[in-house]
Amino acid sequence: EHDLDALIFALVASGLVLARVVVDGVWRYQLGGWAPPWGIEYVVDPLSGGMMVLVSFLALAASTYAWSYLLATDPGRIGLFDSLYLLLVTGLLGIVATGDLFNLYVFLEISAIAAYALLAMGGDRATVATFRYLLIGTVGSSCYLLGTGYFYALTGTLNMADLTERLSGVGESPAMAVGIGLIVVGLAIKAAVFPFHGWQPDVYTYAPPPVTGFVAAAMTKVSAYAIFRVLYFVLGGTPVAASALVFLGGVGVLAILAGSWLALAQTDIRRMLAYSSVGQMGYIVLGFSIGSPIALVGALFHVLNHAVMKSCL
């Protein structure tokens, strides 16, 4: 059975959650009844609720095309595709909603493993491109996990809200700088931020079109959202966060120039769109780095804008 029912449910549920948090404020859920900071906490505010609606909508939109595509090309793998696709959507929704740094890593890995399997369904060249993505993605995941370990060693907690409070008493230290550097690099690899975009062009070119449409629209944007969340909601106001934002600003400018130039040089439209995405991610991280209310609103709006645009293309 196709996954449309599950995706429609996810979209409706995300919409209801967003409506609730807009009216009643931040919604928190303790997994397994264990109170934070010891237990895993999920936190949904209007921003994360909006991202959940966006991910669910994009997943549903791409899935409607995937059904007809698979019927025409490989009907025997529809069940496998549906299972992996729902796992990918679950991972992305978890990244958006979690209030725990390590739990974010878990959902990064869930979404990545599902994405690797889906992207490799495109054939021989897609398999090679996906293997390259797996290697680079593993480096990104390892960097993020090591960075999380540094912050746990400094504060003794992984809960984002508790971590924010404890960091105020830690002060600036080399360990904190290394930790945030590793986390930013790890998430930048996942978001295909220049110069960590090497996996993206081949994956976009050779992977099955329905998978490319969703991965290009949602996966990189969720990782960019995670960068924003960590730098502003977890580490906001710390000197290391300010330094990381300056780094992202320089990277953003280079991404805009390099991504746009490389896109113009392509003759394959899917590869051109891949390099175009590199440039667009540059605009997003540049907006994050500026940090003014207008810049942040513009960057977050461009997350929405580019996700919908790329999915349509």
Locate the predicted segments by residue.
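Transmembrane helix-loop-helix hairpins at membrane boundaries of multipass inner-membrane proteins
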Residues: 1-83, 161-165
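Short, aromatic-rich membrane-interface segments at the entry and exit
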Residues: 3, 102-106
